[in-house]
Structures are given as structure tokens and as C-alpha cells.
Regions:
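Outer-membrane beta-barrel initiation region
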Residues: 24-113
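Hydrophobic, lipid-facing positions within transmembrane beta-strands of outer-membrane proteins
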Residues: 39, 101-105, 131-133, 143, ...
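Transmembrane beta-strands of outer-membrane beta-barrel proteins
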Residues: 42-46, 120-124, 136, 146-150, ...
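Transmembrane beta-strands of outer-membrane beta-barrel pores
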Residues: 45-51, 123-129, 139-141, 149-155, ...
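Outer-membrane beta-barrel "beta-signal"
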Residues: 48, 93, 858-860, 866-871, ...
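Solvent-exposed loop segments that connect transmembrane elements
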Residues: 60-85, 159-221, 264-287, 324-351, ...
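Short sequence motifs at beta-strands and strand-loop junctions characteristic
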Residues: 94-102, 125-127, 229-233, 291-295, ...
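Repeated loop/turn-to-beta-strand initiation elements of outer-membrane beta-barrel proteins
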Residues: 113-120, 141-145, 248-251, 261, ...
Length: 919
């Protein structure tokens, strides 16, 4: 569907004709009569048009049967999609409306009104929502006053729809009649509950003309959803003053204020976990617009004093965050007034709290003799937050919450004993650098960095009631009051061995001390080196390498995984040949956080640039970062955790759960060739590759057979790559005509590849680990559970392509007038397995292996439980047009509503005619 056109093309033609009479006075004045240029302004008209075609399923509106293979349309998408280029990803962070615009203005006016003062004005993309202004007034060498204003939009999606309406800032209501009917269906018997998917999606008996389609509200809830474009607008203003009191002393100050206002998507769960069902007592969830309305304020006052051999500076910085919406309330679409533990009628979310931060900055530098220089900075900080707590819950069915003082109070009231957090943190950043030149061509640098993050927030007792499943157990926030201290010591030597050539070698140590984290202390040692050679003018060569090894003293699970028998913490570092015991609660004892666990890092970068002749320049670069977390010991297991080992192993040995490898590399090449003084060509190519490998374990309560067995370990890898091609040409004719054109393609792919590592059958030891419903006739210690909906299977590939063609023509009509014409074409092709199949309702599906079991929702799920490969039933009715084997929906989403957030593909044309006026 094409966006609506206007008469802007005619405006472009008229604008071009108005430029023609200027040739009558195109002669330039003699050079001696030319005044100095004070600035320039570029203004004109533009027009953009195109198609948003990336969601053909939405363009057709809802399917009348719920099966896109039997009737065109999508499942649960609401009314037909109305594509507008202005709300698409094409204008995600900009405002390119058609018509008149001012691209930029830059002007400096000295000796204002015969005085010694000056004024400077600058703008970028003036007038519309994507704009920037800077004004400066001052006296050279004496003082300067600046005013700056910036504005930028952010459009999140143009495919969203909802029936939520905002009745007050941050308060969202859902139509009463629909809530009542959904509650009635969920409160009925199993047959009544089974009609919820059809009622939501408008299929089966609830399809137009169906037996239950008595009115609009009965013919599919999501089919009545209204379009809603979540977006925010950011506005920021700055005032700064700088004054040189003496040639050596400068005083300065700044005030910055930023506001953000609008809406963005957020998900709410009206339950204690994401699991849900059709019953009124089961959980439910909904995506709603998050109301954004807050200010950031920054104040800075400081001064600098400097002499020839030393200098000092100091400043005070204050940061203040003010949120105009301190909480958000949303009605539960699936529960009108059936108040019960575990089934709330409203959801409550605490928004970002108001907070303040204060910093003092001190810095100085001095020469310690002729060959030594010392630089230092000390920056203490104080962070405060004391926002009032919200009530434990809005659910009146929960009573008797502990308030931290041993008594009981209503759960719908805020904590009585501790009404607010009294959040208190203190930071200290110190940097010391000593540089010396012991010999003519040698430089030695020693640096010490110290950072303290002390969380002094008092420990309070609370009674969490997340999900309103029951009256919670009193607990405290002690484990969340994390603190850390980081110290770095670096020694570096530089040798300038030849003209424009140097070599560097060094060592760095980093000590980390943490509180209320899994690792209390760790040490990372690094060695590095680099070489930079430009001795021969045509050749430039740069290379660097860094090796780092981080080791924790001891890995203690802060979540406290406990033994099923003794209740003691389960260690991961058991003796060789001993299997870690099963656990009852907390994390798997060998799970590791990547920012704390042992790691080996290798990093290398290189650059070569060669100019064999004046007309030709060739360049190439490459870089790689490899993080290896799969270390034996050092807080990890001393023996492989694989269930299958030796010749039967399905993967290499692993000693932890979590990320094992994180690898990224890039390379590229470029060439610039001057065909003549007027024409030059350029071409560039770059490739980026990212790869992460992790291993996890599927867990169920240990009361179930095989609940904690390495036979249910699974592996996931996430290869991603991006390729960028660019070719173009620059043409300059007689210093009058400038023509630039280029084509660029950015292509990216992302995959998530998963597989199980155990065995569904008889293992090499002769034990029957096969999956059987009810756990009959199989071994509890190795029962295979990765079947059906929990099978480890590959996700569909996500793909992104961005083509852009540009041509810019510029002509020097006179010394002051430069007409410019610009054309751009952009095509964005995109599909993401997380968003492209997304609609407002994803619960209209039939059960595993039983197409049609839900009336009007004949969408097949994964095949029955005896499958361990994660295969889908074939054919797949109701699949996404982007992913023929990808099922749109899940039976567990029967009581979930979504906004349908996506950013569809588009192609857009852009033309503009502008005039640069230099004055």
C-alpha cells in the first residue's frame, strides 16, 4: 500500500525554476572586494514517499477462520494494517515531513554593533521534531555564554493495537464488558474455558456469521483493537557560561535539563510465573503502553587554574531525576471482580524513582622535574533515593502482610515500619598517572585507577507478594545491597625506534572485591603490546595484541543451591569422578555468571594502509576478541559435566553452565582511486561475526523423575554476522560542479541453534533413559525430558537487509549561491522470529498432535511427546508467511494479550532541492 502523495513534486520544480534568473548576476567580484564569509544557510523543499510492505498478513486484516491457509489474513491481528512511512522504521529517530525545511544554518557575527563581542548561531534540521540549535555570545579570550536545544523523536512500532485506554497518567483501563465476559468464560467448566481462544481471536463460533457472534464485541476481542503508535519525544536544553577571570583562572558553570514524554511497550504478568491456563485461578498477562514523563537535570559549577608547569581544576556536579508518574496501574483484562489469591484484578508497577547524585571533581597535573609529569584526579560521589514504597499489592484477598516490625497490616497498604528505602550509595573514583622519559626515545607510564562503589542502604524486611499467589514470607533486601571495589595497576613502555614508528609493551592487573555477589574476590592479569610503523611514507602498519586471565578466589553461589537431603549448599568443585548431588532450590550449583567467573581473553587488531601511487590508496583491517569461560577448576567443576563422555560424547567437555565461549571478529578492505583531478572512486567492504555458546540444563522439581540430570543438558549457539558493501564516486568539475553518488548494502543474519546433549533411549551403560509419560519403566537419574514443547530445537533465522542509493548534485552558481539537488532510495527488508510473527493474540492454537481440538483454531503445535528433535507437524496450518514451519502461538498464551510490536520492511524515495546561501 502506497503512502499518499501531495503537490510537493510541483514545488520542487518551481523551486528549481526560481534559481534560473540568478545567472544574470553570476559574475564574482574581484578577490580584493570579497568580504570574509560569516556563515551560510541551506534551505529548500523535499518530498519522500514509499511503501511499508513488510507485513502482508496484517494488510489483509484478520482471517475469518483463524487459519491463514484456508482464508486470507492473519490470526488475531485486529483491523487491517494502515502503513504510513512517517510511523515506520524509516523515520524511527527523525522527522522527514514533506515540504519546506531548513537543513542547517551557521553564522558568526564579530564586533557586534561596533563592540568587541561576537554572536554565533548554528542549527541542524530546524523547525520540525528532529532539530538542534546552538547560540553563543561572548568575547574572544574573555567569556562565553551558550544556549543549546535538541529534540529527537523515537517511534517504536507502527503495528501495535490495543483496547487499553489511559484514564489518568499511568492508569490503564480495559473495556468492562469484555472483562466480564472473559471472567465468565474462565469461571465456567472445561468446555466453556476451551472457547476462550475462539472468543479472543474471532474464530469458530465467534467468527462473523457464527452462532456466538451476536454483536461486535462477541466477534473477536482483538478484532476490535485500535491502532496505537508507541513513541516518545526527547527534548533537552543547556545553558553554559565560561569566564576567564585572569589569563590563568577560568570559572565555568552549566545547567542541562532533559525531558522525555510518550509511551513505549511493556509486559505485565498477573501471576507468580509466566505459566498460564484457561481457569480464572491461573495466571494471565498483557502488554500495555508504559507511560513516560520524566526530567533529567544536571548542574555543574567549577573552575580551572593553570601555570606553565602545573594546573588544577575543581567542580561540583549535581544530577537530579524527576519522574512525574511514580506508578502504573493496569486492569487485568481476564478478571473483572473475582478477587482471589493468585488472581488479581489489577496490575501495579512502580516506575523509576526520583533520585539525586552529587559529585566533587578534583584534578591536577604538574612537572616533577624536567622528565617526569604527574597527573591525578579524585572524584567522590553521593547517590540518594528515598521514594515512598507502593502497597505490597492491590489484591484485597491478601491480608496480614508483615510490615517489618513483627506485626501484621493490610497487604494493600505500603510497609508501615519502613515507608521508603533511604537508598544511600557512595562512590570514589581516583586516577593517578606518572609519565617519564628516562631516555631520548623511550617513554614509561605508570597508572593506578581506583573505584569504590559502596552501598550503604539500610537492610529492611519486606513481605513480597509477587503474583498475589499467597501471603509472602518475610525477607530482607540484604542480598541486593551489592557493593564492589576495583583497582587497576598498569605499567607501559613506549619505544620510538624510527621516524613515525613506535612499539609498546605493558602489563595490567585488576583486583575486584564484591559484596553480596557470587565471587568476593578475583584477580585479572593482562599483558599487551602494539607496534605502529609509518617509516616509509606509502606504508602504514599497526598491530596490537592483549592477553588477559581472570581467576576468582572462590565461587560461592549467592542464591544458595541446597542439597535435597542435607539442605547444605551444593558445591560445583567436587572431587574428580564424583557426580554433584541433586539440589532442591536455587541455581544449578555449576551455573556461572560471565562477569565473575574465570575467563581467558585474547584480543588482536591490525591495520595496513598502502599508497603505491598518488592516485591509489589501499587499506585492510582485522580484529578478533575471544572470551573462553570453559575453564577446568578455578571455581568451575574439576570434571566434565557431560552425561555422555568419551567416544559417546555429543560435544566437547564442559565444566560450567552458562556462557562457554564469546567470540567476535571483523575484517574489511577499502580502496580509493583518483581517475583524474576531477573524478575519484571508492569502494569498501567489512564483515562482522559474533558467536556465543552456552550450555544449560532443563530442570523440573526434584520430586519428578530425572528432575536434575545432566542427561537433560542442552546447548545453544547464536551465530550472527553483518556484511557491509559500499561503492561510490566523487566528481568535481572546474570548482563549480560537485556530484557524489554511492550505493551501500548492509546485510545481517542472526540464528539461535539449540540441541539436546543427552540420550532418549538406552545409554551406553545400558540404562533406559527414554521419555515415558508418567515416568514408568525408566531410570529416575537420567530420564529424558527434552520432548514436545520443551524440545531443544533451532529457532527460525532472523534477517536484515538495508539498501541505499544516493546521488547529490551541487553547483556553484555564484560565490554566495549553491543550488543542490539530492536523491536517495532506501529499502529495508527485515524479518525477526521474535516480532515478525507477532499479533495481538497468540493463544488460538490446538493441542499437540490434535489439529482442530480448539474450535476455529486449527493450528498444530509440536508433535507428540515422543519427539526429541523438536519437529513441527507437517503441514503446518496457521504458520507465519515468513516462517512456513513456525507456529504462530502457544497454548500457554491463551490468557495473554500483546501489542503486536514489529517494524515491518519498507522502501522509500527521497528527493530534495535546496539552496546554500553563503554570506
Amino acid at each position: 500500500m502506497k503512502t499518499r502523495r501531495s503537490n510537493s513534486l510541483a514545488g520542487l520544480a518551481v523551486f528549481a525554476l526560481l534559481l534560473l534568473p540568478a545567472t544574470a548576476y553570476a559574475e564574482d567580484k574581484p578577490a580584493e572586494e570579497q568580504p570574509a564569509e560569516r556563515g551560510m544557510v541551506e534551505f529548500g523543499v523535499r518530498y519522500r514517499w514509499g511503501d511499508v510492505y513488510g507485513r502482508p498478513d496484517l494488510l489483509l486484516g484478520p482471517s475469518t477462520t483463524g487459519n491463514p491457509l484456508t482464508s486470507v489474513g492473519c490470526l488475531g491481528c485486529g483491523t487491517a494494517f494502515d502503513p504510513l512511512l512517517s510511523k515506520s522504521k524509516y523515520e524511527e529517530y527523525r522527522d522527514l515531513r514533506n515540504g519546506f525545511f531548513v537543513r542547517r544554518f551557521n553564522g558568526t557575527f564579530d564586533n557586534l554593533l561596533g563592540s568587541k563581542y561576537y554572536v554565533s548561531l548554528q542549527t541542524q534540521k530546524a523547525i520540525y521534531r528532529d532539530q538542534s540549535y546552538l547560540a553563543t555570545f561572548g568575547e574572544y579570550g574573555k567569556f562565553r555564554v551558550q544556549f543549546r536545544y535538541d529534540e529527537i523523536p523515537h517511534v517504536y512500532s507502527d503495528t501495535t493495537r490495543t483496547l487499553f485506554t489511559e484514564t489518568a497518567p499511568g492508569v490503564w483501563s480495559f473495556p468492562t464488558q469484555i472483562r466480564q465476559q472473559l471472567q465468565t468464560l474462565a469461571s465456567g467448566n472445561a468446555a466453556t474455558q476451551a472457547t476462550i481462544p475462539s472468543f479472543m481471536a474471532g474464530t469458530g463460533a465467534f467468527a462473523p456469521g457464527g452462532a456466538s457472534c451476536a454483536g461486535a464485541v462477541d466477534c473477536g476481542v482483538v478484532n476490535n483493537f485500535n491502532f496505537f503508535t508507541p513513541s516518545i519525544i526527547r527534548k533537552a536544553g543547556t545553558v553554559s557560561v565560561s569566564y576567564n577571570l585572569t589569563p590563568d583562572l577560568n570559572l565555568n558553570g552549566m545547567f542541562w535539563r532533559e525531558s522525555q514524554y510518550g509511551f513505549r511497550p511493556i509486559g505485565l504478568i498477573f501471576a507468580s510465573s509466566p505459566s498460564t491456563g484457561t481457569s480464572i485461578t491461573s495466571g494471565s498477562g498483557a502488554e500495555v503502553p508504559e507511560a513516560i514523563s520524566y526530567f533529567n537535570n544536571l548542574v555543574k559549577v567549577g573552575g580551572e587554574y593553570g601555570k606553565r608547569s602545573w594546573a588544577v581544576q575543581g567542580a561540583f556536579v549535581g544530577s537530579f531525576f524527576q519522574n512525574n508518574i511514580n506508578q502504573m496501574l493496569a486492569q487485568n483484562p481476564f478478571n473483572f471482580n473475582n478477587v482471589a489469591a493468585g488472581s488479581p484484578t489489577t496490575g501495579q508497577v512502580d516506575m523509576y524513582p526520583n533520585n539525586q547524585a552529587y559529585y566533587l571533581n578534583f584534578a591536577g597535573a604538574t612537572d616533577l622535574g624536567k622528565w617526569v609529569r604527574l597527573m591525578a584526579s579524585i572524584n567522590p560521589g553521593w547517590l540518594r533515593q528515598n521514594d515512598a514504597f507502593l502497597p505490597y499489592t492491590t489484591n484485597t484477598a491478601l491480608v496480614g502482610c508483615q510490615d517489618g516490625a513483627g506485626g501484621a497490616q493490610a497487604c494493600t497498604a505500603p510497609p508501615a515500619a519502613v515507608p521508603s528505602l533511604h537508598g544511600d550509595k557512595q562512590t570514589l573514583a581516583m586516577n593517578y598517572t606518572l609519565v617519564t622519559l628516562p631516555w631520548k626515545n623511550f617513554q614509561v607510564k605508570a597508572a593506578y585507577r581506583h573505584y569504590d562503589y559502596n552501598n550503604n542502604t539500610p537492610v529492611h524486611t519486606f513481605t513480597p507478594t509477587q503474583g498475589d499467589s499467597a501471603n509472602g514470607t518475610a525477607t530482607d533486601n540484604g542480598s541486593r545491597a551489592t557493593s564492589f571495589n576495583r583497582k587497576n595497576l598498569e605499567l607501559t613502555g613506549n619505544w620510538y625506534f624510527a621516524k613515525r614508528s613506535s612499539a609498546k609493551a605493558g602489563y595490567e592487573a585488576e583486583w575486584m572485591d564484591r559484596t553480596h555477589r557470587d565471587v568476593n574476590h578475583s584477580l585479572e592479569n593482562s599483558v599487551f603490546g602494539a607496534v605502529d610503523v609509518n617509516y616509509w611514507k606509502p606504508l602504514l602498519f599497526r598491530a596490537s595484541y592483549r592477553y588477559s586471565s581472570r581467576k576468582p578466589d572462590f565461587y560461592h553461589d549467592e542464591e544458595n543451591s541446597t542439597d535435597t537431603v542435607t539442605g547444605l549448599e551444593v558445591p560445583c568443585t567436587v572431587a574428580p569422578g564424583v557426580t554433584p548431588p541433586q539440589f532442591a532450590a536455587g541455581d544449578q550449583p555449576c551455573s556461572r555468571r560471565f562477569d565473575e567467573t574465570a575467563r581467558i581473553r585474547n584480543r588482536a587488531d591490525g591495520l595496513v594502509q598502502y599508497t603505491p601511487m598518488d592516485k591509489l590508496t589501499l587499506s585492510a583491517f582485522a580484529g578478533v576478541v575471544q572470551d573462553d569461560y570453559n575453564r577446568r577448576g578455578d571455581g568451575n567443576s574439576l570434571t566434565p559435566l557431560n552425561y555422555l563422555t568419551g567416544a559417546n560424547a555429543t560435544t566437547s567437555p564442559y565444566y560450567l553452565y552458562g556462557i562457554l565461549k564469546d567470540i567476535s571478529y571483523n575484517y574489511g578492505a577499502g580502496a580509493d582511486y583518483a581517475v583524474s583531478h576531477q573524478v575519484s572512486l571508492f569502494a569498501e567492504y567489512s564483515h562482522e561475526h559474533y558467536y556465543r555458546r552456552l550450555i544449560s540444563r532443563y530442570r523440573v522439581p526434584t520430586t519428578a523423575a530425572g528432575g536434575d540430570s545432566s542427561n537433560n543438558d542442552w546447548e545453544s549457539t547464536t551465530p550472527e554476522q553483518v556484511d557491509v558493501w559500499t561503492v561510490g564516486a566523487d566528481t568535481y568539475v572546474g570548482k563549480k560542479v560537485y556530484f557524489t553518488t554511492y550505493y551501500t548494502l548492509t546485510a545481517g543474519t542472526a540464528n539461535t541453534l539449540s540441541r539436546f546433549l543427552g540420550v532418549n533411549g538406552v545409554d551406553p551403560n545400558g540404562t533406559n533413559c527414554a521419555f515415558q509419560i508418567g515416568g514408568v519403566n525408566n531410570a529416575a537419574g537420567c530420564r529424558f525430558l527434552l520432548v514436545g514443547g520443551t524440545a531443544a530445537t533451532n529457532y527460525p533465522e532472523s534477517v536484515s537487509r538495508l539498501h541505499e542509493v544516493a546521488a547529490v548534485f551541487k553547483y556553484k552558481l555564484t560565490k554566495n549561491l549553491w543550488p543542490k539537488f539530492e536523491f536517495r532510495y532506501q529499502q529495508f527488508d527485515y524479518k525477526d522470529q521474535q516480532t515478525s510473527p507477532m499479533t495481538q493474540y497468540m493463544g488460538c492454537v490446538s493441542g499437540a498432535g490434535t489439529p482442530g481440538s480448539v474450535p476455529g483454531c486449527p493450528v498444530a503445535m509440536l508433535t507428540a511427546g515422543n519427539s526429541n528433535a523438536g519437529q513441527f507437524a507437517t503441514p503446518v496450518p496457521g504458520s507465519s508467511p515468513f516462517y512456513p514451519t513456525f507456529v504462530v502461538g502457544d497454548t500457554s498464551a491463551v490468557r495473554y494479550l500483546f501489542l503486536g510490536v514489529d517494524q515491518p520492511s519498507y522502501h522509500a524515495y527521497y528527493v530534495s532541492a535546496t539552496l546554500e546561501y553563503h554570506f
